[in-house]
């Protein structure tokens, strides 16, 4: 049973996706109740009552829907053989990235694994830049040279192709923040399959030793490639994995719960208490990568059940519509605008100019004098250029 409060009136309504709602100020803001947070070595944790404004609700819904549609477009481009190399989709896990980003301040940093399209979009790249990067276009996020796994943004350090490679990188970024006496946090994202990597334990030891402002975030989607978590981990309570590092479990399919947990964890780090581990319980709809149909180690019925009962976008839409924050007509208009943006981006990904061969020698080093480029066949003196400089030169 859910009670929706509009001004002083109580209107009972029923929805399995919402535990409790209170709405004030003519439905311009609302308070929802999340699933309880599980805690490790913490006396208290985030409040389960989370507040959201209409503006933020629309923003989060639009971002999650955009990522979902963008990933669908990326999958289609791959099937058309327009995407070369690997391609890992984020469909189903949108609330993890959107909720985390919503809790970040301008100076905070993030680093993640190869499932990075959504994070790249949230870090300032347009949908067109992401899709053009996938198809090797000069208008891509990194001029078409990075592909699916290597995209970047302001204070977003990738996109890393090696399992767990971002764990020590995030620790190093947090060390730099503390060294510079900056009140910021580095959020280091990885999957459940990477929690058994030795470098995670090494990183957490150093982070706790020096009380670095780093959040280790495990996006537990249930499968490391094609292996269920219980078949590879002696304990699947990943929020306790840090032992001496405190941890929080959060429903990773609830964008507001994710935002609440990360906000609380950031306050912990900024108070000088050191690192914290967050496990976000989520799910991926696609296979590990586009080469994996995702049906040999789980059933289609399992995937459909999650879509029906736990989908982060549908669940959030039901909440904000029930609360009166948005109308069905507003939802339809958002859907229309997102489709329009995706369609335009797909067209660019097909037609924009491909990255020229001249860019192969750019971005090797920064600001160095002209010299011979090693491992090339032409004995020609080359100036080390950035891709931006090379593109400008080619345009002349």
From Swiss-Prot:
Primary residence: mitochondrion
Annotated pyruvate binding sites: 88, 114-115, 153, 161, 163, 192-194, 221, 223
Gene Ontology terms: biological process: glucose metabolic process; pyruvate decarboxylation to acetyl-CoA; tricarboxylic acid cycle
Protein name: Pyruvate dehydrogenase E1 component subunit alpha type I, mitochondrial
Modified residues (Phosphoserine): 289, 296
Catalytic activity reported: N(6)-[(R)-lipoyl]-L-lysyl-[protein] + pyruvate + H(+) = N(6)-[(R)-S(8)-acetyldihydrolipoyl]-L-lysyl-[protein] + CO2
Keywords: Carbohydrate metabolism, Glucose metabolism, Magnesium, Metal-binding, Mitochondrion, Oxidoreductase, Phosphoprotein, Pyruvate, Thiamine pyrophosphate, Transit peptide, Tricarboxylic acid cycle
PANTHER family reported for this sequence: PYRUVATE DEHYDROGENASE E1 COMPONENT SUBUNIT ALPHA, PYRUVATE DEHYDROGENASE E1 COMPONENT, ALPHA SUBUNIT BACTERIAL AND ORGANELLAR
Binding positions for Mg(2+) per the UniProt entry: 192, 221, 223
GO molecular function, one term: metal ion binding
Localisation per UniProt entry: Mitochondrion matrix
Transit peptide boundaries: 1-25
Function: The pyruvate dehydrogenase complex catalyzes the overall conversion of pyruvate to acetyl-CoA and CO(2), and thereby links the glycolytic pathway to the tricarboxylic cycle.
Pfam family, one: E1_dh
First-tier enzyme category under EC: oxidoreductase
GO cellular component terms, A-Z: mitochondrial matrix
Complex and partners: Heterotetramer of two PDHA1 and two PDHB subunits. The heterotetramer interacts with DLAT, and is part of the multimeric pyruvate dehydrogenase complex that contains multiple copies of pyruvate dehydrogenase (E1), dihydrolipoamide acetyltransferase (DLAT, E2) and lipoamide dehydrogenase (DLD, E3).
Positions bound to thiamine diphosphate: 114-115, 161, 163, 192-194, 221, 288
């Amino acid at each position: 049973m859910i009670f929706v409060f509009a001004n002083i009136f109580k209107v009972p309504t029923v929805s399995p996706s919402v535990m409790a709602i209170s709405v004030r100020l003519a439905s311009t803001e609302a308070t929802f109740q999340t699933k309880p947070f599980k805690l490790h070595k913490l006396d208290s944790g985030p409040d389960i009552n989370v507040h959201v404004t209409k503006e933020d609700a629309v923003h989060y819904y639009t971002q999650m829907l955009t990522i979902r549609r963008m990933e669908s477009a990326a999958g289609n481009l791959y099937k058309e053989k327009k995407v070369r190399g690997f391609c890992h989709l984020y469909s189903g896990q949108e609330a993890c990235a959107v909720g985390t980003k919503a809790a970040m301040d301008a100076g905070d940093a993030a680093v993640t694994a190869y499932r990075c399209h959504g994070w790249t979009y949230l870090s300032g790249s347009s949908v067109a830049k992401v899709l053009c990067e996938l198809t090797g276009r000069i208008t891509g996020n990194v001029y078409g040279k990075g592909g699916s796994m290597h995209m970047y943004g302001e204070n977003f350090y990738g996109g890393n192709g090696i399992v767990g490679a971002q764990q020590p990188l995030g620790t190093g970024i947090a060390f730099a923040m503390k060294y510079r006496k900056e009140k910021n946090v580095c959020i280091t994202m990885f999957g459940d399959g990477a929690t058994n990597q030795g470098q995670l334990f090494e990183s957490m030891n150093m982070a706790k030793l020096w009380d670095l402002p780093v959040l280790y975030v495990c996006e537990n989607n249930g499968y490391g490639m094609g292996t269920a978590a219980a078949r590879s981990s002696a304990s699947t309570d990943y929020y306790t994995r840090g032992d001496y590092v405190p941890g929080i479990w959060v429903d990773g399919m609830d964008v507001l719960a994710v935002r609440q947990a990360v906000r609380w964890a950031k306050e912990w780090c900024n108070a000088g208490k050191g690192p914290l581990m967050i496990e976000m319980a989520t799910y991926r709809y696609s296979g590990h990568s586009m080469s994996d149909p995702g049906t040999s180690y789980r059933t289609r019925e399992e995937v459909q059940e999650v879509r029906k009962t736990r989908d982060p976008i549908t669940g959030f839409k039901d909440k904000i519509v029930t609360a009166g924050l948005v109308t069905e007509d507003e939802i339809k208009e958002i859907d229309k605008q997102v489709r329009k943006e995706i369609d335009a981006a797909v067209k660019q990904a097909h037609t924009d100019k491909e990255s020229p061969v001249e860019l192969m020698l750019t971005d090797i080093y920064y600001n160095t004098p002209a010299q011979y480029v090693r491992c090339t066949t032409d004995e020609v003196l080359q100036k080390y250029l950035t891709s931006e400089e090379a593109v400008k030169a080619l345009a002349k």
